[in-house]
Every structure is written in C-alpha cells, then in structure tokens.
A protein has these predicted regions:
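Residue-level detector of conserved, function-critical positions
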Residues: 30-41, 45-47, 67-84, 105-106
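Surface-exposed loop/turn elements that mediate protein-protein interactions on large endomembrane-trafficking
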Residues: 16-32, 55-69, 92-106
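Short beta-strand elements that form the blades of beta-propeller/WD-repeat-like
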Residues: 2-12, 18, 42-50, 54-55, ...
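Beta-strand-rich domains and repeat architectures in extracellular enzymes and scaffolds
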Residues: 2-9, 26-37
C-alpha cells in the first residue's frame, strides 16, 4: 500500500509553488508558469487553473486529472478528497479525479 504524505501548506516563492508537509518540510516544487493559478488545496490534493482548464495534482505534482472550466463550472472549495464546483444552478461534488460524486440545486 502506498503511503500518503499529507499536504499541510502550499506556498509561492520565487515563481515556484512549494508543497510542505506538517513539519514544514518541502515535499515537492514546480514552476508557477507550468501550473497556473492555485484555486485550492487540501491534505490530499491541489486544484490549479491554467488556460481555462482545471488540473488536479497529488502531493508530488503528479496530475490526477484535468477538465475544461466550461465542463466543471466555478470551483467553490477543496476539502479532504473532494472539490465542490458550481455550474449554473447546481453544485457538483467531485472527487480528486473530477468524477461526480453528487449534485444538488443551489
């Protein structure tokens, strides 16, 4: 079984995003221009937006998934292993691979 390293913080420094563990130790880093805008993160994954596409990454910046903004809508929040997106009059709860878990009317 693969050990999961908890994401405790993400910082932008010298045009690089750094993922830190609970001790403040660097887990990984990647250039800002490769990732785009940080939308949100949890202890499990991160969501970035670049050129109208949302990207989900793990703690090593390995891509979990990507989907068009037009397909997902607006990212409301990222918590645990889920992210909530608002599209039209619906809120979609999605996993870290952007698979739909549930949806509800706003």
């Amino acid at each position: 079984m693969e050990e999961h390293i908890m994401i405790a913080d993400v910082i932008l420094k010298n045009k690089q995003f750094y993922i830190l563990d609970e001790r403040g130790k660097e887990i990984s880093r990647k250039w800002e221009d490769e990732l785009g805008e940080l939308i949100g993160f949890s202890d499990v994954f991160l969501v970035f937006k670049r050129r109208d596409i949302f990207y989900s990454y793990d703690e090593n910046f390995k891509e979990n998934a990507h989907k068009w903004v037009s397909e997902l809508g607006e990212c409301k929040n990222v918590v645990g292993s889920i992210a909530n997106f608002r599209k039209g009059e619906h809120i979609f709860t999605r996993d870290r691979f952007f698979g739909e878990i549930s949806n509800r009317w706003v």
